[in-house]
Amino acid sequence: TFFDMAMMNLQGMDFQILAAGPLFKFNEAISFVITCKDQKEVDYYWKALTAKGGEEGPCGWLKDRYGLSWQVVPEQYFKLEAHKNKAKQEYALKAVLKMKKIIVADLEEK
């Protein structure tokens, strides 16, 4: 065939994705962001999307087995990123830059 196609359903929404070999390849210019309420959700989506050949990337990014890019980010990170306290913003950013899968407990100083 000229392309690989996959169907998936995310929270009730159907998606059809395709990779057309050298014609159209997935890249990081297009990614899905999953905002997670807690570490349990981060772990769930991270494990599911990296299974069967997916690849971990830096800073909460990963590629699924089809090569599609995802960002799995806890809502706590977005809250810290927008926090009025610049030190909290900076700490969270520096922490995420050292991670692959984001660990919620490590986003704030102890």
What do these predicted regions represent?
Residues 1-56, 63-110:
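Glyoxalase I/VOC metalloenzyme domain signal
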